[in-house]
């Protein structure tokens, strides 16, 4: 395997002079910072604060992938996505991945294989998502989604997942990026986590 190219040389950081929390909710917060840019210019920078999250590519023993169809209020549409959600306080990423998969689909994995994590909105937030491939998934319960979640479960072959991605039908970054990593076999190069 080819080694990846190095990251670009780091730029000088911004200097933060003040930080004010201007909005809080159970789901997110908004912070207004006053910073000096490397050029010396003073500027306000608004930062969206969202806790860490997980997303899971569930793979059944026959190789099919489980996707969830979910309605999203902000744009009023239903799309195919992956089971995903925020970590509870003091919850480990793997435990959160198992919990979200079970809650949203009723499925549990034999094994979790880590994928590279990512920052879905790195221009406005330090929000980070950990990603996993869940292998050997079997249904062990009925889904128990949150009251605001409208979810349906669909099973897709690898070729159907590729077709959905190619057609632009998977538009959620929490689904598209981990699915692309899975299709490339990235999870096979990582250390596995056995079922608990």
Predicted regions and their residues:
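Conserved Nudix-box catalytic region and its N-terminal flanking loop in Nudix hydrolases
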Residues: 2-13, 45-48, 55-99, 147
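Acidic, metal-coordinating catalytic segment for phosphate/diphosphate chemistry
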Residues: 14-55, 61
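Hydrophobic residues on conserved beta-strands that form the core of alpha/beta folds
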Residues: 16, 30-32, 44, 68, ...
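Long hydrophobic alpha-helical segments typical of transmembrane helices together
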Residues: 162-196
């Amino acid at each position: 395997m080819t080694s990846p190219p190095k990251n670009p040389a780091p730029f000088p950081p911004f200097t933060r002079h003040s930080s004010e929390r201007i909005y809080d909710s159970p789901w997110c917060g908004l912070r207004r910072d006053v910073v000096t840019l490397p050029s010396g210019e003073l500027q306000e920078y608004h930062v969206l604060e969202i806790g860490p999250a997980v997303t899971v590519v569930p793979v059944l023993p026959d190789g099919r992938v489980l996707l969830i169809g979910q309605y999203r209020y902000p744009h009023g549409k239903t799309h195919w996505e992956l089971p995903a959600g925020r970590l509870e306080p003091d919850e480990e990423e793997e435990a959160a991945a198992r919990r979200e998969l079970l809650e949203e689909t009723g499925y549990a994995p034999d094994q979790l294989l880590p994928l590279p994590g990512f920052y879905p909105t790195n221009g406005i937030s330090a929000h980070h998502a950990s990603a996993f491939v869940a292998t050997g998934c079997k249904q062990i319960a009925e889904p128990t989604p949150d009251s605001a979640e409208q979810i349906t479960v669909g099973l897709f072959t690898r070729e159907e997942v590729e077709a959905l991605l190619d057609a632009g039908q998977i538009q959620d970054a929490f689904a598209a990026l981990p699915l692309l990593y899975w299709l490339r076999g990235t999870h096979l190069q990582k250390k596995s986590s056995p079922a608990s």
